[in-house]
């Protein structure tokens, strides 16, 4: 389901993905709070449309202002334990990893997914980018289904 929100003008491009981090202290007293702070914290979104006819509004967070966009929750690609990697099944992230130089690190600690949270697997992609996990984990690359945010 699509949501209309405000986003920094530099980020306002169809296809841009971001994780909504919530309110900044600079948002206090802003007249656009209701239109801007209307997404679910920690969820990854994709901009599906930029309201070009919309006005560019001043913002204390974004130096070039904000504009209206349509966004939808989007999937998160992640590594999970191979034994849990079944399309339609549920899995959790395997746990934190200190090996930031590993080609799989962005999938072991993906933006838009939290540890100790179960996600539904939409697609199984297969082998992860790394050749060997330095933590000796057997991992498979999957895509988590976008969360249902209709309660927002």
UniProtKB/Swiss-Prot annotation:
Family: Belongs to the UPF0179 family.
PANTHER family the UniProt entry points to: UPF0179 PROTEIN MJ1627
Entry protein name: UPF0179 protein HQ_3004A
Domain of life, per lineage: Archaea
Name of a matching Pfam family: UPF0179
Record InterPro entries: UPF0179 (IPR005369)
């Amino acid at each position: 389901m699509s949501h209309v929100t405000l986003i920094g003008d530099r980020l306002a491009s169809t296809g841009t993905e971001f994780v909504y981090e919530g309110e900044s202290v600079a948002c206090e007293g802003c007249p656009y709070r209701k239109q801007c702070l209307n997404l679910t914290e920690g969820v990854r979104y994709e901009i599906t449309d930029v309201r070009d006819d919309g006005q560019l509004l001043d913002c204390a967070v974004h130096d070039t202002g904000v504009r209206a966009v349509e966004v939808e929750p989007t999937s998160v690609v992640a590594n999970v334990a191979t034994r849990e990697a079944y399309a339609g099944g549920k899995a959790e992230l395997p746990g934190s990893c200190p090996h930031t130089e590993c080609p799989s690190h962005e999938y072991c600690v993906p933006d838009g997914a939290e540890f100790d949270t179960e996600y539904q697997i939409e697609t199984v992609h297969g082998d992860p980018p790394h050749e060997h996990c330095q933590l000796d984990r057997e991992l498979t690359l999957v895509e988590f289904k976008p969360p249902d945010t209709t309660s927002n």
